[in-house]
């Protein structure tokens, strides 16, 4: 009986410590007078006449080869 009361007391103290712990925030230590210079370029070409059936077949093959066995193994491990 004494051991269960001790464990319950320790569990309550542990939970209260977590609940009332101060929030910790990560702050960047940077020079406030630093210059922020950045360049971003994006170049892309889109083909409006893409053959979706060709890509759908490739995606389907990958799903059948890897996805279904993986899903089956996960389902078996859960049950």
UniProtKB/Swiss-Prot annotation:
Pfam families: Pilosulin (PF17499)
UniProt keyword annotations, A-Z: Amidation, Antimicrobial, Secreted, Signal
Subcellular locations according to the entry: Secreted
Pro-peptide positions on chain: 22-48
Tissue spec. comment: Expressed by the venom gland.
Residues that bear Glutamine amide: 78
Signal peptide: 1-21
A GO CC annotation given for this chain: extracellular region
Family: Belongs to the formicidae venom precursor-01 superfamily.
Function: May have antimicrobial properties, like most ant linear peptides.
Identification of the protein by name: U-myrmeciitoxin(01)-Mg9a
Organism for this UniProt entry: Myrmecia gulosa (Red bulldog ant)
């Amino acid at each position: 009986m004494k051991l269960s009361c001790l464990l319950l007391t320790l569990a309550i103290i542990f939970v209260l410590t977590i609940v009332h712990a101060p929030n910790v925030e990560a702050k960047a230590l940077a020079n406030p007078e630093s210059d922020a210079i950045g360049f971003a370029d994006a170049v892309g070409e889109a083909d409006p006449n893409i053959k979706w059936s060709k890509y759908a077949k490739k995606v389907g093959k990958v799903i059948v080869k890897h996805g279904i066995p993986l899903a089956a193994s996960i389902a078996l491990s859960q049950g």
